A protein has these predicted regions:
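N-terminal hydrophobic targeting/anchoring segments and the immediately downstream early-domain regions
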Residues: 5-197, 249, 253-415
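Distinct, well-ordered alpha-helical segments
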Residues: 163-167, 226-238
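Active-site glycine-rich loop that binds ribose-phosphate moieties when present
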Residues: 199-208
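Substrate-binding cleft of carbohydrate-active enzyme catalytic domains
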Residues: 211-222, 228-232, 262-268
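Short His-Asn-centered micro-motif
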Residues: 222-223, 245
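Short hydrophobic/aromatic-enriched beta-strand-loop microsegments
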Residues: 240-246
Length: 415
């Protein structure tokens, strides 16, 4: 089937300058003395009763390439439904991910649709544990049943050219959130943070896509976008946007981290920032060491842009070598972050933009160098306890754990 015929068919488908940055890692943290027992994991009553939602988890790459089942407990990786239940996680932005490997051969559209289809199949297969959510009311209804609510979020391009007909087809399939950037590669309408600037932010096509997503009631995710692209996307949208997973540039000057300027702009529009769980974006000591090693923990444009492989199956074999996704390698003991240090990053955001605009976007199974107290999603209560040690009120913690995500979804998608 020709590309244009495929498209036609698919469209017919029913500045925190006052914050003491140095204090993040210059003094001992409570985490150094926290009892740590992976077999006897504590869960505060607050965490058990709260609505908990993760803004970014990689959950389908393994299932696509290895034929596994998210409803079963894995012996490796970070995320599956049994462990999510143990961690008290009620809902997740399920990342439907297309990595850069698929771009040279222009397989990004095919991969996107097959991963979305797989996600729907996995949800149906495990219907006793999980349901697809299209809006905030769905999430709350599913949560009351004691099931996981899956809110699909696209990471990577549905089409490098930004075909709006394909966007509409994905909406009909149940996709309600899309990251505008093509991961770390600039596409036809928006600049990414790790690639060359082609558009000075976003272009007219990017603004047209934003208007379309506003009309469809789709959440606009600007993680991986350049600073100018974030600012311009916020200005172009009539709805709040999200930055699903990352850190603050004011703490770690990694291009993937959001600047204070962009964070304030996003919050002023009602948006939410999800804090990534990895050391690379949150631990300045680790960042300096990693820079000294002259290694990168992020896929760079060009590293997978060599001669394209002939078939999508050949690309699958290359991606499979990296599953479960991991960029962390070996972390020297002195650079291994504690969960209390991650909580201080959250507090940086609270001081900068307020408690109504902060949340969690772990990137579990996406490769982060996790804090030493967090092995997988079952350890999510560690985040609640770390925020309690900061002296946060129950109300503030509940917002950060999930209510802020729920608010944005309600405002964007309606009921």
């Amino acid at each position: 089937m020709k590309r244009r015929d495929l498209i036609k068919t698919l469209t017919l488908l029913p500045l925190a300058g006052s914050f003491p940055i140095d204090s993040l890692f210059a003094t001992p943290v409570a985490g150094n003395n926290v009892p740590f027992n992976m077999q006897n994991k504590p869960m505060p009553d607050l965490h058990r009763k709260a609505f908990v939602m993760d803004g970014h988890t990689h959950v389908m790459t393994r299932e696509l390439l290895m034929g596994t089942d998210i409803g079963q407990r894995y012996t490796d990786g970070n995320v599956d439904l049994p462990r999510a239940k143990e961690g008290g996680v009620d809902a997740m932005f399920f990342s439907v991910y297309t990595p850069e490997h698929y771009y040279p051969g222009r397989f990004e559209t095919k991969n996107t649709f097959r991963v979305v289809n797989l996600a729907l199949d996995q949800i149906k297969k495990n219907h006793s544990q999980i349901e697809l959510a299209l809006n905030a009311s769905d999430i709350q209804r599913i949560n009351k049943k004691g099931k996981m609510a899956a809110f699909l979020d696209l990471e990577g391009p549905w089409d490098m050219d930004g075909d709006i007909n394909l966007l509409r087809a994905l909406h009909r399939l149940g996709l309600r959130s899309i990251q505008l950037p093509a991961h770390n590669t600039t596409n036809a309408f928006i600049d990414t943070c790790n690639d060359v600037s082609r558009w000075g932010g976003i272009n007219d096509l990017g603004r047209k896509i934003i208007r379309e997503m506003n009309e469809l009631g789709m959440v606009i995710n600007i993680a991986h976008a350049s600073n100018d692209a974030i600012l311009q996307s916020v200005e172009a949208s009539k709805h709040p946007l999200i930055y699903s997973h990352g850190g603050f540039y004011g703490i770690v000057p990694h291009p993937r981290c959001i600047t204070d300027e962009a964070a304030k702009s996003l919050a002023a529009k009602g948006g939410v920032i999800g804090i990534h769980f990895g050391s690379l974006f949150n631990n300045p000591i680790y960042w300096k060491w990693q820079q000294g090693q002259k290694k990168s923990n992020e896929t760079k444009p060009g590293t997978v842009q060599a001669a394209p492989l002939k078939t999508i199956e050949e690309v699958d074999k290359e991606v499979l070598k990296e599953v479960p996704l991991s960029f962390r390698g070996t972390i020297p003991e002195e650079y291994w972050m504690h969960v209390d240090q991650l909580a201080k990053v959250i507090d940086y955001g609270v001081q900068l933009v307020g408690e109504d605009h902060m949340a969690l976007g772990s990137d579990l199974d996406g490769g982060p160098e996790l804090p030493r107290e967090i092995k997988d999603i079952s350890d999510y209560p560690q985040m609640t306890m770390a925020m309690q040690r900061l002296g946060y009120s129950d109300t503030r913690i509940k917002k950060i754990l999930g209510l802020n995500w729920l608010r944005v979804i309600r405002e964007v998608t309606g009921n």
